[in-house]
């Protein structure tokens, strides 16, 4: 939800037009995260305020506004900081006044872009209004800009990092922030807590080291030659504020030279920095990135990037590694496809192979998951395996639950992260939790992860995004390696999660002789899964015809499955809801008689999953019950069915029962896609939805 993009050039000459185009291009790469408005800010001409553009709607409107303005785009800058943002409304309706950047005052002395939600913004606003601050928007973000100005006005000589520390100490909630100020030209500060923020580094010269030292504050007390500090702001310790704007004594900052970004002569060289919510807008310019940790404060000044900590405690490592992204720009482009969704559906044969690459030896029928090896014995001795996820990721967990129970003989629980957080259930130290998330930044899953860690359980991450919060905070994990997924509705990430979890079940049962034959059967099935997915994709034309002829005018749908295919029914219903805006319900076939049959008549659109597995007799019984009440379901099956004239049958290839859901979900992906296209919906960015759900 929301997207931040910032661009800083130092000793690299760029004109204002180039900078604005870079911002717009970055925001377009972040569109998939979900948003309803956008904005950006660049420096004005000498002596002028910042130039800001804000528009409600898609980024192309912002781009048109910039093109139509009379701003001098040829003005050149040798040192410049620009910030931009796509907003998902949480406080205040989508409107230009509520768009980011938010400003501190009419002269924009401080401007801020922000992802997340500040939970104490009402208290902050009340105190700042009592100090004469006049608010112009409904956003929580404006509090940050006004608090920065308040501290600046009441603290003579404060440097940007010290000011930022004083601001960030007062904030509660989840956030990623970029702050720019006319009082600190050519500088920008950034921080994160519970919301992702990445720094890209582009330099023609080789970096001296591949890390940045974390600069911890020196304790103010007891340092020789330093006066005992006093509270900088009377309001900080005012009892009337009930502890809000706390009276923490400021730490003295220790500023060292940033080793990575200086030349042999000890001075910074030409360099560019890119701040972003994820890697997609950065890889066009550089693959060298650094992932900020919670409560890091990144400060760019005179070409140097410094990372400070808000407090001495916490923070883990004393360095932040500059990593190389294994991602190509082509992976985030649509190519010759009309939409990202159909591109990602068609990429599934390759994405599934990437998930298995280097992990499965099909000749010897061995599965190796190096990320779990150190914890293998602990996992095997677990009291319970508890999967925690949201949305599509939750469905992938439901899909593999029977297989884990069958192969590991360990009790398995699947939890919705939001419900888990609300209940705060008992957690035992010998439990193993498996957190599944495409982005690795899902807010509810992160809260559940924190609760799990506090209770001493082992946490495993299964994510698609390398360097994400879940991948860093869990003890170990498995990357699904599906590649960037831009469409809000998940397709290839779902099937890659499915396969990654199947690999985990196979890996955890490697020592079970009694299950050897079953394991070999599944591994042989995995060897053919890419080809069978490709074969299933050949059904595209038939599924398109079914969507147009039978479902285009329907506003509801029942999807019925059983066993391994209950998860397929849930995921299929979610796809139909997300993309075609048709109310759909995934139903467990065994629950038909407990209420759902009341909805069945000859006008109710129904899709039934009838795979040729051990549950087929029961699934067929459900079909007969539906047919007896006038229902005429579309059937998805891998079995040759006779005497069903007049029924639409989508026949998919047959594979091992526990893998059949990978093939059976593809017709739903295509069905929802064509319904959305024919109805004229925005396929890649459905209304009201976001790719990365980073707030509760």
Swiss-Prot record:
Molecular-function GO terms, alphabetical: carbohydrate derivative binding; glutamine-fructose-6-phosphate transaminase (isomerizing) activity
Domain of life, per lineage: Eukaryota
Cellular component annotations (GO), alphabetically ordered: cytosol
Pathway(s) served: Nucleotide-sugar biosynthesis; UDP-N-acetyl-alpha-D-glucosamine biosynthesis; alpha-D-glucosamine 6-phosphate from D-fructose 6-phosphate: step 1/1
Reaction(s) catalysed (UniProt annotation): D-fructose 6-phosphate + L-glutamine = D-glucosamine 6-phosphate + L-glutamate
Residue stretches spanning the membrane: none
PROSITE patterns: GATASE_TYPE_2, SIS
Occurrences of domain Glutamine amidotransferase type-2 (ranges): 2-303
Domain SIS: 375-514, 547-686
Biological process terms in GO annotation: chitin biosynthetic process; fructose 6-phosphate metabolic process; protein N-linked glycosylation; UDP-N-acetylglucosamine biosynthetic process; UDP-N-acetylglucosamine metabolic process
Keyword Transferase among record annotations: yes
InterPro entries reported in the protein's UniProt record: GATase_2_dom, GFAT_N, GlmS/AgaS_SIS, GlmS/FrlB_SIS, Ntn_hydrolases_N, SIS_dom, SIS_dom_sf
Pfam families: GATase_6, SIS
Enzyme Commission numbers on file: 2.6.1.16
UniProt keyword terms in alphabetical order: Aminotransferase, Glutamine amidotransferase, Repeat, Transferase
Active site per UniProt: 2
Keyword Repeat: yes
Functional summary from the UniProt entry: Involved in amino sugar synthesis (formation of chitin, supplies the amino sugars of asparagine-linked oligosaccharides of glycoproteins).
Protein name in the entry: Probable glutamine--fructose-6-phosphate aminotransferase [isomerizing]
Organism: Schizosaccharomyces pombe (strain 972 / ATCC 24843) (Fission yeast)
């Amino acid at each position: 939800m929301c997207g931040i993009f910032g661009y800083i050039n130092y000793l690299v000459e760029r004109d204002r037009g180039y900078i604005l185009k870079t911002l717009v291009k970055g925001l377009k790469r972040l569109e998939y995260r979900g948003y309803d408005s956008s904005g950006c800010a660049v420096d004005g001409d000498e002596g002028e305020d910042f130039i800001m553009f804000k528009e409600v709607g898609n980024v192309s409107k912002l781009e048109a506004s910039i093109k139509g303005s009379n701003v001098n785009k040829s003005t050149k800058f040798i040192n410049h900081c620009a910030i931009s943002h796509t907003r998902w409304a949480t406080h205040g309706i989508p409107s230009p006044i509520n768009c980011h950047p938010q400003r501190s005052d009419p002269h924009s002395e401080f401007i801020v872009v922000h992802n997340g939600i500040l939970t104490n913004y009402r208290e902050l606003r009340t105190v700042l209004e009592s100090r004469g601050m006049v608010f112009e928007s409904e956003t929580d973000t404006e509090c940050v800009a006004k608090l920065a100005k308040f501290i600046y006005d009441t603290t003579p000589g404060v440097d940007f990092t010290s000011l930022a520390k004083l601001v960030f100490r007062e904030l509660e909630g989840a956030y990623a922030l970029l702050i720019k100020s006319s009082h600190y030209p050519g500088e920008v500060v950034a921080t994160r807590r519970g919301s992702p923020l990445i720094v890209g580094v582009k330099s023609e010269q080789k970096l001296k080291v591949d890390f940045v030292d974390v600069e911890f504050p020196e304790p103010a007390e007891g340092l020789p030659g330093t006066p005992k500090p006093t509270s900088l702001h009377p309001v900080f310790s005012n009892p009337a504020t009930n502890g809000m704007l706390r009276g923490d004594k400021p730490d003295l900052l220790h500023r060292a030279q940033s080793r990575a970004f200086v030349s042999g002569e000890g001075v910074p060289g030409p360099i560019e920095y890119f701040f972003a919510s994820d890697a997609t807008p950065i890889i066009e310019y550089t693959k060298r990135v650094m992932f900020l940790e919670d409560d890091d404060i990144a400060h760019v000044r005179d070409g140097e990037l410094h990372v400070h900590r808000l407090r001495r405690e916490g923070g883990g490592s004393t360095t932040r590694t500059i990593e190389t992204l294994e991602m190509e720009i082509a992976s985030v482009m649509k190519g010759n496809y009309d939409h990202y969704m159909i591109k990602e559906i068609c990429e599934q044969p390759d994405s599934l192979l990437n998930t298995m690459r280097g992990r499965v030896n099909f000749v010897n029928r061995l599965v190796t998951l190096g990320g779990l090896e150190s914890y293998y014995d602990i996992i095997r001795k677990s009291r319970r395996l508890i999967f925690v996820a949201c949305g599509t990721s939750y469905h992938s967990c439901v899909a593999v639950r029977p297989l884990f129970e069958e192969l590991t003989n360990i009790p398995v629980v699947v939890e919705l992260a939001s419900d888990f957080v609300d209940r705060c259930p008992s957690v035992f130290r010998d439990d193993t939790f498996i957190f599944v998330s495409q982005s690795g930044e899902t807010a509810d899953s992160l809260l559940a992860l924190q609760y799990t860690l506090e209770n001493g359980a082992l946490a495993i991450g299964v994510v698609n995004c390398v360097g994400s919060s879940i991948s860093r905070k869990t003890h170990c994990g498995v990357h699904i390696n599906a590649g960037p997924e831009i469409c809000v509705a998940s397709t290839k990430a779902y099937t890659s999660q499915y396969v990654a979890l199947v690999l985990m079940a196979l890996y955890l049962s490697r020592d079970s002789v009694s299950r050897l034959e079953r394991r070999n059967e599944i591994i042989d099935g995995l060897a053919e899964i890419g080809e069978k997915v490709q074969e299933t994709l050949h059904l595209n034309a038939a599924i398109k015809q079914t969507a147009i002829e039978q479902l285009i005018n329907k506003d509801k749908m029942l999807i019925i499955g059983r066993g391994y295919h209950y998860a397929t029914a849930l995921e299929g219903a979610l796809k139909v809801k997300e993309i075609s805006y048709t109310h759909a319900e995934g139903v467990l076939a065994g629950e038909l008689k407990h209420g759902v049959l009341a909805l069945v008549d000859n006008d109710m659109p129904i899709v039934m999953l009838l795979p040729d597995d051990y549950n087929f007799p029961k699934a067929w019984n459900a079909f007969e019950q539906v047919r007896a009440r006038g229902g005429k379901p579309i059937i998805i099956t891998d079995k040759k069915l006779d005497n069903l004239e007049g029924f639409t049958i989508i026949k998919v290839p047959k594979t091992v029962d526990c893998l059949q859901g990978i093939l059976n979900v593809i017709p739903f992906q295509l069905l929802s896609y064509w319904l959305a296209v024919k109805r004229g919906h925005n396929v890649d960015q459905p209304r009201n939805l976001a790719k990365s759900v980073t707030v509760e």
